């Protein structure tokens, strides 16, 4: 007979809450800085307002009680969801009230999407351009119209009711946030029951969520889109409740519906292949993925996650224990392996958040690439403005998340890391050989930087000397990306063996025939050459530098040879005190600050590469004589020199935004100008010393005192850290808004 160890015993799922732990007090809530003893006394100097903003959401600084911190984070998540539902509701409301959605639905190839009409106050109505179908408004590039069509929405009334539903959900979220902090707040053990959490998130959110969406796609989206693709007037299409209740309508479109669920229980699942398909490629009518393929995908994903939702041990003594999995994971060269990591991930939400942000950010950038390589919604691929916007948006979101991962990993190291619990495990071993890691990474950055930039400088020099035969290019000295070409070719050929019934490979980027909708290229094979090889190595360089900065910030967050007691100074500090020169700008916060600039560098080049490559080699019109691309394939010839990037991309393509005045795109011209100003304004904070401003302020205060109009709250210059924060915020805001206006004015004009 075997007696199971205490660890083997299941962690019972139980509702563990404290009733009425914190009273609801509007008086307390209305008092600025109520969460801090110092701040709640009110302002003595202008630094107070900055500290208020810095610490309002830094729950660690309000209390050291992990349970209380967990409750605040949990409650704040509901507030965040409420705000998201309000935002989403606003999007749907604009679609219902101020858009040409129904007109677009009837002719998506000629009518452009618009859901914003500018009020005429002092002439702003110039922004309401003619988007077709007798509608004047601002052309939008969010992709909502394509998403709505894919969802099976056929009228503005449906958008209106969904918008109201969004507000109801927002109210429910705000109530839940209040209820789970003030009325029934979960105990710490509930937050730390990871097996139960994994089962619920995997099985419930991802499994049942995907199943519900697959059900919607099968019963509503597929029939509606099949009828729309066949040219049926949206007003003639049966409403969702007809499709759900009247099996005859569905059986007309998908014969297997007549058989009901018998094939499911008799395991004749292939009967359902009329609506759960495996075609591959794009629908030639809409230029989007086959919606029957995506429905099939969501059914498969649902099955996977419903299985995953039963993998972890809770009420019954079967399944995995996260702690056991981690601690059993021990390689021959890695000491204690993952021992101690379970404790870190259940007591440090910063560590948890760092991992999630890194994964989520990487996923966002992967999504950016899938949106053009495998456009998921009807008529998305031929809406070039939306394609460019979605790529840029998901790339930048990913970058911010990844820098956030570096930030929270460093905060974990400073605030939550306990060296006594981490002896010779993976984390300890990484920290002990951090010098080797960072110096190797530094060498890689130098190698990539000099070699990739060196290729460009060589080409610029040869070009200036009139020696094109000595340049690296597809027509002279070729540097073909042979591995990338091999991957493309393999992905193009493989489905013929692995999926013989598929019509095409997963994406047209691999190869095959071009798909055009309404005479515009939706997607076609993307050929890679010397120019792509060169800019790819610039991507490698900038990404490695970003990682170097963030990783150095994390690994040296607690101590360094320069400042052995860094952990005592905290996450952000300007210098190691007076009288110790050369120790400024070494805090973990400063590494995040620098990492943001390199993230911006990296991603600017990524989105520039995408924008130019697509205009040159993919996007364009199809005529009898072939494909006419927007910039006529000039990427391969011009993108191999720095001068080519400046002249044929930045300068040549900025003419639309610079000359937009007096047209419906004039707002982009003003934003372009204003955002340059915001960017330049940031330099005032980044290139200045705090003492200069303090001195200036004191002389101004002296003048006010002379006139007896001195303020009661003493003005103070921003601290070094505050100044850098304001600087980087404006640098990024200015840079992003400049790029946004440049891209949109260009692509709306020529796309």
UniProtKB/Swiss-Prot annotation:
GO molecular function: 4 iron, 4 sulfur cluster binding; chlorophyll binding; electron transfer activity; magnesium ion binding; oxidoreductase activity
Broad class of where this protein is predominantly found: plastid
UniProt keyword Oxidoreductase present: yes
Effect seen on changing residue 676 to Q: Impairment of P700 function. More severe
Positions with a binding annotation for chlorophyll a': 676
Cofactor: record remark: P700 is a chlorophyll a/chlorophyll a' dimer, A0 is one or more chlorophyll a, A1 is one or both phylloquinones and FX is a shared 4Fe-4S iron-sulfur center.
Gene3D superfamilies: Photosystem I PsaA/PsaB
Alphabetical list of PROSITE patterns matching this protein: PHOTOSYSTEM_I_PSAAB (PS00419)
Residues bound to chlorophyll a: 684, 692
Membrane-traversing stretches: 73-96, 159-182, 198-222, 294-312, 349-372, 388-414, 436-458, 533-551, 591-612, 665-687, 725-745
Membrane topology per record: Multi-pass membrane protein
Catalytic activity: reduced [plastocyanin] + hnu + oxidized [2Fe-2S]-[ferredoxin] = oxidized [plastocyanin] + reduced [2Fe-2S]-[ferredoxin]
Keyword Glycosyltransferase carried by entry: no
Binding site for phylloquinone: 693
Binding residue positions for [4Fe-4S] cluster: 575, 584
Effect upon mutating residue 676 to C: No PSI detected
Keywords per UniProt: 4Fe-4S, Chlorophyll, Chloroplast, Chromophore, Electron transport, Iron, Iron-sulfur, Magnesium, Membrane, Metal-binding, Oxidoreductase, Photosynthesis, Photosystem I, Plastid, Thylakoid, Transmembrane, Transmembrane helix, Transport
Top-rank lineage group of the source organism: Eukaryota
BP terms from Gene Ontology: photosynthesis
One cellular-component annotation, GO: chloroplast thylakoid membrane
EC number of the protein: 1.97.1.12
Cellular localization per UniProt: Plastid, Chloroplast thylakoid membrane
Summary of subunit composition and partner proteins: The PsaA/B heterodimer binds the P700 chlorophyll special pair and subsequent electron acceptors. PSI consists of a core antenna complex that captures photons, and an electron transfer chain that converts photonic excitation into a charge separation. The eukaryotic PSI reaction center is composed of at least 11 subunits.
Family as reported in the entry's similarity comment: Belongs to the PsaA/PsaB family.
Protein name: Photosystem I P700 chlorophyll a apoprotein A1
Upper lineage: Eukaryota, Viridiplantae, Chlorophyta, core chlorophytes, Chlorophyceae
